[in-house]
Amino acid sequence: MSRPQAARGAVTADDGLLLIDKPAGVTSHDVVAAARRMGATRKVGHAGTLDPMATGLLILGVGRATRFLTHLVGADKTYEATVRLGQETITEDAEGEPTAWRGCPAPSGQDERAAFQGRLDAALARLTGAIMQVPSAVSAIKIDGVRSYKRVRDGEDVALAARPVTIHAIDLLGAPRPTIAAGPAGEQVPVVDLDLRVSCSSGTYVRALARDLGEALGCGAHLTALRRTSVGPFDVDEARGLAEASAEVESGANDDPPSGLRTLPLAEAARRCFPALELSHDEARAIRYGQGLPSDALARAGAAPERSVTAKAVTASRSADDGHAADGGDEGRGVVAGFDPDGILVALLTRKGGRARPVLVLSPA
């Protein structure tokens, strides 16, 4: 696995979000490293890991926006996935060694196809809604300070506790695709590939969803492809590839004066993520000094944007490797973005202790 090449930025990138369409075969950390080089700054982080095999939307924060990322971690996500029925692997995806070849013969005839579709629809329905999901054992979850995947590689039997997640929808994209896989002795094993669109809460493991679908159908399964298409209000169609971003930086170095890596301004990102609260000069000054406002000030906030980040603000620490949010209890529910009269993003605020208080000040005094 080679690291992506990236041009070195001539000037430091502005604070903001960077939407990258991650290619397969590179880690999320590799993308962060490339962004640091292109943005000429060490202050770059991401809002949730994608496995090396996966492609799609990776949201990076540059400069002060790294602090904003905490409030994106809990956003809902959408994926396009391919699941292979009839074969299991140790990692529950195509990167791991196969562990079982149960096979999934293609249904023949109208009656068999209808029966298969009925069982598939029922299995998908059982996996939709608020469910308890056992995360993949080969994951970055820590057990007594040691990553679960390391324990598995060291030969341990790992049993992770089920966690609550919400699967908003699972849509079948096209008809099931019967195909053939090679068995342990080179024999032909009939399998079926399913293309799915999954809309889910943060913390969902699509690999585990594939595993559980295979178990529900009695044939086993694993994930063969995964692409993240949205995070909260942001879509992969807005993202740039690493090569495109690098070419932009290289070209900008020759401008007079030189220009740097383009980012999505924090104010624009906040308006897309949260209801907007327009502050007076006095209110903005108070917030910049860390003071609260009367709680009824929050009632002036506008309507929540479409696909807004309605998840609670995260105040506990999160894992930098797996990107899953820790639960901050009631803290941060009903977050709004406060803007001064000049349109500058001052802070994210929420109701706390009977006051509207800042949970993140982005434009200090």
What are these regions (language model features)?
Residues 1-23, 29-46, 50, 54, ...:
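Accessory RNA 3′-end/elbow-binding domains used by RNA modification enzymes
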Residues 2-208, 212-238, 348:
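RNA pseudouridine synthases
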